[in-house]
Amino acid sequence: MPSTLPGTTETSCNFASVYLMEDLVGVSGHSAVDPEQRANRMESYFTDDSNISNWSVWTALDTYLIIKEEWGWGPITEALSVYYNLSPANVPSTDEEEFNTWVLHISNATGHNLAPYHNAWGFPLTEQTYEALTNLPVWVNDPLRGDYYRYDAIIKNLESNNVTTSTTDISWETSRRCVDVWSTC
């Protein structure tokens, strides 16, 4: 199934179970989604340099659940639905294509560039994926930031003013850790 990322068949089943339990029954569903267990798993995964080959069933589920906790089920179901309308030529055929296609669909569904978030998890993203998402704002307040993963600095609106032969005033905006606010430097 093209909407199932490499190595995540069991994760997809668990994800569907979480959705059904939360949406239809009104309970959290499984003890493995307990906040303490999730925190321990993520700490272990990121301490091991977020190697995608170690992206196990429950760790992969955490990747999806964090997105669900930020935006709800809507963007996830929207992103998954896209796969069922793809022409055969557009169905991802390699692991790398599957990871990159998912990041494009979920980013467009949330309205945020989730490439840095998925890169933090170790997804093998291409430059084309990053470039395709430059029109979307980066999700700068994701819960990985600071606690589990240290992102590269996000700089935007880099400008130079008052240029002379010996000096230049440079200004830019950076995101502050865990805050969706831009500050001018």
Regions found by a protein language model. Give the residues of each.
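Active-site-proximal alpha-helical
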Residues: 39-130
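Flexible domain-boundary/linker segments
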Residues: 29-31, 81, 135
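Zinc-dependent metallopeptidase catalytic helix centered on the HExxH motif
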Residues: 1-40
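Beta/coil-rich, acidic/histidine-enriched accessory regions frequently appended to metallopeptidases
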Residues: 95-185
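Proteins with a high burden of low-complexity, intrinsically disordered sequence enriched in S/T/G/P/A and R
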Residues: 1-12, 75-77, 81, 166-185
